[in-house]
Amino acid sequence: MSELEFEIERRRTFAIISHPDAGKTTLTEKLLLFGGAIQLAGSVKGRKATRHATSDWMEMEKQRGISVTTSVMQFQHRDRIFNLLDTPGHEDFSEDTYRTLTAVDSALMVIDSAKGVEERTIKLMEVCRLRDTPILTFINKLDREGREPVELLDEVERVLNIQCAPITWPIGMGKRFKGVYHLYEDAIHLFSASHGDRIVKGEVVEGLNSPKLDELLGDIADELRMEIELVRGASHEFDPDAYRAGRQTPVFFGSAINNFGILELLDAFAEYAPPPQARQARERLVAPGEDKFSGFVFKIQANMDPAHRDRIAFLRVCSGRYTKGVRLFHVRSGKAMQVANAITFQADSRENVEEAYPGDIIGLHNHGTIQVGDTFTQGENLKFEGIPSFAPELFRRVVLKDPLRSKALQRGLQQLSEEGATQLFKPLRNNDLILGAVGVLQFDVTAFRLKAEYNVDCVYEAVPVTTARWVSCSDPKKLEEFKRKVHDNLAEDGSGYLVYLATSRVNLSLTEERWPEIRFSATREL
């Protein structure tokens, strides 16, 4: 096995998906704690405390206690290197999450034991389905009263259309929560709630029939034996191949806030989650073990370090090896560039990276030349597929309070829209700046960041736009005629692509009927 193959086999690149408040950010913290990446876990809801969750690093996230950008964190466990992409928990940020899910090889789904499968989880599972992403499930908050485990598994199977294979099984819940039984190790891990910030090895009883279990649990021990017999008979057996094909999800139970059930989850992840897989480019399939480097940009983050006003392009390595100072070919621009200062992440702390392998996420300093969806190679013309941009559903005109700050506003909006949470449109008929977003929170975030990072005060005004469509046509003459006739409804997006801004759904339908040669697209492949 070559060094490259060895390093690929060690990598596990994954994202955590959940409905807001299912405990995703807490679980992220605890995975890092167990992986040795952070010494003290910062509780997410302690907003006024000095300690904050490592992954919620941006100022607004610290104030509101929700994740609104994707963080990248690397940690090690059992000689495996985990790259964890923490995704926004708030539903307004679906586009950022969607793109992040194109950069992972598997996902960890977190479900609140009291609430079961929720709307956001269903949407994210649909996204994972498009690429048959393997899913591992953690049912959280067993230290609180919740629904029956059998009922939860049944709901996951029915609503998400995926087989469940329980690996651990809870013993009681809420005040009666005693721990979990590991079905494949025949061991009972007893619950201890006293170690929120420290890793304490809890007591483990080997064997379901151990007399020690009767000593510790009394009558509950016999109830557990009967329950486990029923569970074994009624549930699916874990099949690693079905899991890797995205047809089955292994299920773990625990309490992230109490560090309980995390180790079993991590051990299974290290053993069964897939290493970096081959990636489809327009030209061919790219295998991770190829000698030549390739990778794609799935996210751009402005002002990760407000002191430096920088923009970082997050790049997923797909093949070969990155080494410091390597010359890379930026396919879209056709230019070569030397990359000497790529960085690796731990939420907002960063360090220069000497080398990186397939599955790793590296940050490239971006001076406005790199866009989401860009491919980097060592000379080959490749374009990785499957990174979409969606037509926004909400629109606002941006109005500057101080006209002298107009350049700073334009720069700020351009840089923030490059991240992809909002989109910037410049109408052809005037100098307006129109922002489009998937949800209202994105407008709040943009205004907050314009003030905090660019010292620009702005307000929003309503604008008569209901939806947007990217327009294209194979006949240049027809396109020119279209541009003349509907000039007042046309704008350019932040990348210079032509967009039709519809005043209503009816307006869009009529325009599509009148111009059958023009293609109107609700998504644009980046």
From Swiss-Prot:
PROSITE patterns in the cross-refs: G_TR_1 (PS00301), G_TR_2 (PS51722)
**InterPro entries for the chain:** EF-G-like_DII (IPR053905), EFG_III/V (IPR035647), G_TR_CS (IPR031157), P-loop_NTPase (IPR027417), PrfC (IPR004548), RF3_C (IPR032090), RF3_dom_3_sf (IPR038467), RF3_GTP-bd (IPR041732)
According to the UniProt record, one GO cellular component term is: cytosol
UniProt KW keywords: Cytoplasm, GTP-binding, Nucleotide-binding, Protein biosynthesis
GO MF terms here are: GTP binding; GTPase activity; guanosine tetraphosphate binding; translation release factor activity, codon nonspecific; translation release factor activity, codon specific
Gene3D superfamilies the record matches: P-loop containing nucleotide triphosphate hydrolases (3.40.50.300), Peptide chain release factor 3, domain III (3.30.70.3280)
Q: SUPFAM superfamilies recorded for this chain? A: EF-G C-terminal domain-like, P-loop containing nucleoside triphosphate hydrolases, Translation proteins
Biological process per Gene Ontology, one example term: regulation of translational termination
- Subcellular localization, as worded in the UniProt entry: Cytoplasm
User: Which residues make up the binding site for GTP?
Assistant: 18-25, 86-90, 140-143
Similarity field: Belongs to the TRAFAC class translation factor GTPase superfamily. Classic translation factor GTPase family. PrfC subfamily.
> What role does this protein play?
Increases the formation of ribosomal termination complexes and stimulates activities of RF-1 and RF-2. It binds guanine nucleotides and has strong preference for UGA stop codons. It may interact directly with the ribosome. The stimulation of RF-1 and RF-2 is significantly reduced by GTP and GDP, but not by GMP.
Question: Would you tell me the protein name for this molecule?
Answer: Peptide chain release factor 3
Show the taxonomic lineage: Bacteria, Pseudomonadati, Pseudomonadota, Gammaproteobacteria, Methylococcales
Q: Which gene encodes it?
A: prfC
